[in-house]
Amino acid sequence: MTDKIRTVQGKVVSDKMDKSFVVAIERTVKHPLYGKFIRRTTKLHVHDENNEAKLGDVVEIKECRPVSKTKSHTLVRVVEKAVA
């Protein structure tokens, strides 16, 4: 298989778990009737083996095989550190 692995960027909204965190991915969708663009947010649980990502960081994640019941993404890199 030569499918491209899907990577997305998002902001870390929770890092209270060990070796994992929650990232919020924001997208805009057009309202079907009125045409106004609306912001929609998707929250994903991400596996972080070395606990690199912290609250507020912008991170790049990729899809992988399921690590647990809710985690099916892994951390690729921290794009931007949060200002503390």
From Swiss-Prot:
GO CC entries: cytosolic small ribosomal subunit
InterPro entries, A to Z: NA-bd_OB-fold, Ribosomal_uS17, Ribosomal_uS17_bact/chlr, Ribosomal_uS17_CS
PROSITE patterns: RIBOSOMAL_S17
Keyword RNA-binding found: yes
Keywords: Ribonucleoprotein, Ribosomal protein, RNA-binding, rRNA-binding
GO molecular function, one term: structural constituent of ribosome
Family annotation (CDD domains): Ribosomal_uS17
Biological process terms in GO annotation: translation
Function: One of the primary rRNA binding proteins, it binds specifically to the 5'-end of 16S ribosomal RNA.
Record text on subunit structure and interactions: Part of the 30S ribosomal subunit.
NCBIfam families: PRK05610.1 (NF004123), uS17_bact (TIGR03635)
Family per record: Belongs to the universal ribosomal protein uS17 family.
HAMAP family listed in its UniProt record: Ribosomal_uS17_B (MF_01345_B)
Protein's name according to its UniProt entry: Small ribosomal subunit protein uS17
Gene name for this UniProt entry: rpsQ
